[in-house]
Amino acid sequence: MRKAHKKRSIHLVCNAHLDPVWQWEWEEGAAAAISTFRTAADLCEEYPGLIFNHNEAILYQWIEDYEPSLFQRIQKLVQEKKWQIMGGWYLQPDCNMPCGESFVRQILLGRRYFREKFGVMPTTAINFDSFGHTRGLVQILAKSGYDSYLFWRPFPEDCVLEKEEFIWEGYDGSRVLATRAYGGYSSAYGWARLKTEAFMKQRPDIVCGVLLWGIGNHGGGPSRVDLENLNQLTRETEVLDIRHSTPEAYFKELKQQDLPVHKKDLNPWGVGCYTSGVKIKQTHRRLENEFYAAEKMIASAWCQGMMAYPEAQLQEALKDLATSQFHDILPGESIQEVIESSLQIMDHGLEILSRLKAKAFFSLTQGQTPARENEIPILVYNPHPFAIETDVVCEFQLADMNLSGTFTQVTAYQEGQPLPTQVEKESSNIPFDWRKRIVFNAKLAPSQMNRFDCRLEAIPQKPKPELKVKDKRIVVKSTDMEVIINAATGLIDRYRVRGVDCLSKSACHPLVMFDSEDPW
């Protein structure tokens, strides 16, 4: 029982950090989640006062799918306030690389799940294990109903803070309370008391502190040994109120303090993770772009009554995207089996989106005017809510093989006006004038289908570009760019963009550089 005269406190947040994948595949992660949650439920039912905290909707979904009886026990413990739904996100993503909307969806997936299954909405976001945190997160957190943020990385030696407890301010002035957890998110078996004592020694003047404990990385959570040791420490300590708690309870007490304001990212850590595993990163970005573009197209077609809204399929693709953003997947430092299965998950999402986008596209093309003779219509959807100017690249098939010896020239028109158009080498290597690949510059109206009519004209022969060499130089210029190629060496002597030289004199030369084999 706590003594009323104790002014200072340490909130013990029992958890069991469990990466769904990392040095193991997801099936092993699911098994570890079941084992960990079962042990935690047993101890919560046995020990009065113990509160187990855990996050990540993906883990709870595994429990719900593979051990429903345990899931029901957890629901009961949450109602009894012996089990705290912590964080409330789908999982702990990388917190630098996803776009802002993806962070919103991580939160949305988690919030909806935990509200439906447990009737709760956490107000403290947690990303203990993410390798850094963009400042842009702050306004997303604040506008999503969070008032606080608990993290661990980057370490103090990598990211120096005025104080470990602070107010984090975003670009727009939004603010959340934030704390860098002492000594990591877990404690080794039998070491929870030692970690707590070390914290007390290192922060002797702490007024309100938080300490994460419980066996972690591959799950584990609380143990009877650690619980007995911590309960004994609580009884022996006179100057501090040490109690089992939750992140929300900690931050409710912390907000009474006068804290410094931090107006920067929380970076860096593990910088190699942001250049390693390029295939994972490229596929993720493609999936991310495809999802939001397809979703906008589908919404437009649905609003116009052209198709039913495929909510279940979109949710499936969104979960594939959210999973790919996990902080041990997107940075690319998991084992090869995880990398391969993660690419498979992303390909699954891409396949769903490919089919949905095609359906939306064909729905949105309804009612188009038939093409005239010697014209090929090209339809381009702009998913953005604003007009854009871009280069459109497309291929199409002529009505038949052109075996006459002439060449089919193509010019794109928009509303009867010709556009700058270039015929390029098509993907096919069949040596006939049959497939056509063109590029044209155009302005696309927002959130709608844009039509371009490609007019076909037979000319005597395929145009041959002329290479003009002057003063032993080949010069290529546009309004923004200038490239000068040395005709004698073949090297680029100048590459200037908007008046800024982008190449030094030593550019394009091979270099021997020291590199580290450490991917972190």
Language-model features: locations:
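Beta-strand-rich N-terminal accessory domains
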Residues: 387, 455-512, 517
